[in-house]
Structures are given as C-alpha cells and as structure tokens.
C-alpha cells in the first residue's frame, strides 16, 4: 500500500511539473501570430512513456497479485495461527479462543506478528466485525452462517474496533478494543484468564453476586457464560464498551473503572439503550461493594 501510494504521488508530481512547465514555456504571447513548429512524432519519447508505465505497473502489480492470492489461504487449521471465534450480540462482542480454553468480551487480546484466524457469527441480528487500523470488515449473518477472515498485527498497541452494520438503537455504541501485545505477555494473559478467582470475603456480597451476577456472567471458574465474561474486567479500557476507564483528572467526563461499573449496574439502559441487561434490584451499598470487587479483578500480564 505504501509503495503504491509513493509511486502514484511521484507520477502525479512529475506530470504536473511537466504540464506546468509546458503551459508557461510555450504559451501564446501577445502579438505572436506565428504557427509553432509542427511535430509529427518522436519514437524515442513514445518508447520512454510506454516502457516506464509498464515497469511501474509491474512493480505495483506483483505485490498486489501476491496479496490477492494470499487472501485465499486457509488458516483455520494452521497450528501457528491464533484461532478466535467472534460472536456479535446486541450490543457487545464475545471472543473465544477455542484452542486455548479462554472466553472473554469487549477486548480482543492478540500477539503481535502472528496470524489471527477469525470465525465470525451473530447471536441475533446482522452485525459487521471491523478493526479499521488492522483489517477489513466481515459481516456476521443470521441463520448460523460463519464468515472467516485473517489478519496480522505487526506492532503492539491498542486499536479501536466497531460494528459496521446498523443493528439497533445502540449500534454506534457497539465498540470494542483490540490489544496487541508481545508473545510472552499474551501467554501470561491466557494463563491469568484460567486462574481461579475468589469471591468477596463479605458473605452477603458473595451471595448477592452469586444470585444476581453469576447467573448470567462468569468470573474465572465461577458462574455461566451467557453474557460478557467479567474475568479481568478491572483491567479493561472501558465498561460496556462506552464508559471509558481513567483516573486522569484531565478527562473530567470519564470515570474510574469502579465509578463506571456503578453507573452501569445502576441503570444499563441509560448507558446503552436496548441492551439485554436489566436494571437489577440492588441497594446502593450492594452496588458499591460489587463495583469495588469487580474493579479489583485485574489481570497481570
């Protein structure tokens, strides 16, 4: 892509410079009634401006053809690729690593320099999985259809992912993050996701968590995975894909992960209209305690 753009920019500059020079140098001057020298043709110039474009097309065409044929490769059985099952929900994303025994939500963590093999489907309506800075998009079609795509991140960083198909009132809020880390960090993250997680020491809060949260969500080896897995939620960039987690004072409109969890638990519909999570009947003290516990679920990788 960079090579192609560079070639195009160079060609455009050369053409415009020559065109500008010719227009100025050979313009009709006031009082000049003469007829310019008539040129029938110039074989040398014609050969030059025929051969040069051919060479440029070959330079651009070879990597293009290689890239196009590369798209036909199937990495679903490649032992060196990271296999990820992506499931789109209204209005969140589920990421399962079937070969690693890990399932998470809203943040896709991948190793740099490794082929990522994605199998995408939807749990409800039409969505589209899109990471603008890393890959193209692939639709998740209803009816049990599975679409595939492959990509590779060449450097570490955090990238924004989005749903690229109108899917309901909170379509614009259906964002997710992609974290690209080195291979060692990725391996530590996988191990951390599998570690057992202790419930709150306060038995009342532990009971509330079991009855109100773990009937839909999973935390470590506890609960069920019907809805977003909450393991390591304290380390995530956002809550609900919308509330950005930050403690930095310059971001006055955002909140800490604990504050954002309180906001979400109190009234999910106010944050993300149309979400399937209901407003749970909890006291402020219970919400505070659960938010504090969840905010403490951090992963060290």
Model-derived features: positions:
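The canonical Cys-X-X-Cys-His
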Residues: 163, 209-220, 261, 277, ...
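Sequence/structural segment immediately N-terminal to covalent heme-attachment motifs in c-type
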Residues: 198-223, 227-230
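Detector for the c-type heme attachment site
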Residues: 164-167, 216-223, 235, 266-268, ...
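Extracytoplasmic entry segments of secretory-pathway proteins
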Residues: 1-112, 197
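Electrostatic cytochrome c docking/interface patches
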Residues: 101-104, 183-210, 301
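Axial heme c-ligation environment in periplasmic c-type cytochrome domains
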Residues: 171-174, 225-230, 247, 264-297, ...
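Gly/Gly-Pro-rich "capping" loops immediately C-terminal to redox-active cysteine motifs
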Residues: 152, 175-182, 218-260
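Membrane-embedded segments
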Residues: 82, 92-96, 104-182
